[in-house]
A protein has these predicted regions:
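Phosphate-binding/catalytic loop of phosphoryl-transfer enzymes
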Residues: 1-117, 229, 235-249
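ATP-binding/phosphotransfer module of carbohydrate and carboxylate kinases, centering on a glycine-rich
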Residues: 21, 25-29, 47-51, 102, ...
Length: 249
């Protein structure tokens, strides 16, 4: 499968509808389509038995940066199922250009792809880490070195975590979240670095800090979170179809 269309393109909904219909016709069963961050949020919400009344959010770190939200026990999708594009929140008005058309998107600074690019700018890291492989293997090499005490690798990852924490704090402020889970392949090896940064930033700047804390947790299965959420979607479609739009078949 090809990546999802760039945020903001008008053909996104039509592309997903065609994908659902085509797959359903080909395999002969109903088909659900959901983005990875939203699916991960739903899976984390169900597996953690979060109270329905709690405003729950999930940050999904991979080659992009996404978010998912569960309010009142239901996944929040927005007007066109495009809610949660955290990666395209600008943190620098004159920053790096993004394919979405904006400047300074957090995805250009905090995604696993951005972290690998930053690591490759350090000759000492290129000399001792396998950074010429695939994006995922190169990122894992940086993350592993960071948690094992490499100061340069740690600095690169910590800077990415700082960028992500600023965007995630803005998200928590905007939605008055009570719990936030970090998940996705990007936190599988070095989640503690991201969690420490986010907890510190929330404790200093979250608007709700005098009323309630924002609990930050790490996913128990960050690499599989989206797949687990997809399974939850299937279960939810059978027991609460009103919360699962876009079923083809």
């Amino acid at each position: 499968m090809t990546p999802a269309p760039v945020p903001g393109r008008p053909d996104t909904a039509a592309t997903l509808a065609e994908l659902r219909a085509g797959l359903s016709e080909r395999i002969g069963v109903p088909v659900l389509v959901e983005n990875d961050a939203a699916a991960a949020a739903l899976g984390e919400f169900w597996s953690r038995r979060v109270p329905r009344e709690q405003a729950f959010g999930c940050v999904y770190l991979s080659t992009g940066v996404g978010a998912g939200f569960v309010f009142g026990g239901a996944l929040f999708r927005g007007a066109s199922s495009g809610a949660g594009e955290l990666g395209h929140l600008s943190i620098r008005y004159d920053g790096r250009p993004c394919p979405c058309g904006n400047l300074g998107c957090v995805e250009q600074y905090a995604s696993t792809s951005a972290t690998v690019r930053a690591a490759r700018e350090h000759p000492e890291l290129r000399a001792r880490l396998p950074l010429d492989g695939t994006g995922s293997s190169a990122y894992d090499a940086v993350a592993r070195a960071a948690v094992n005490g490499d100061p340069v690798a740690y600095a690169v990852l910590d800077q990415a975590a700082e960028h992500l924490s600023r965007a995630a704090t803005s998200m928590a402020n905007l939605l008055d979240l009570g719990r936030l889970v970090l998940t996705g392949p990007g936190v599988a090896l070095a989640g503690s670095i991201y969690a420490r940064r986010l907890r510190g930033h929330l404790s200093r700047t979250a608007h709700s800090r005098q009323r309630h804390s924002v609990t930050v947790e790490l996913s128990a299965q960050p690499r599989d979170a989206a797949g687990i959420g997809a399974a939850v979607l299937v279960v939810q479609a059978s027991v609460a179809p009103g919360h699962t739009p876009g079923v083809a078949g």
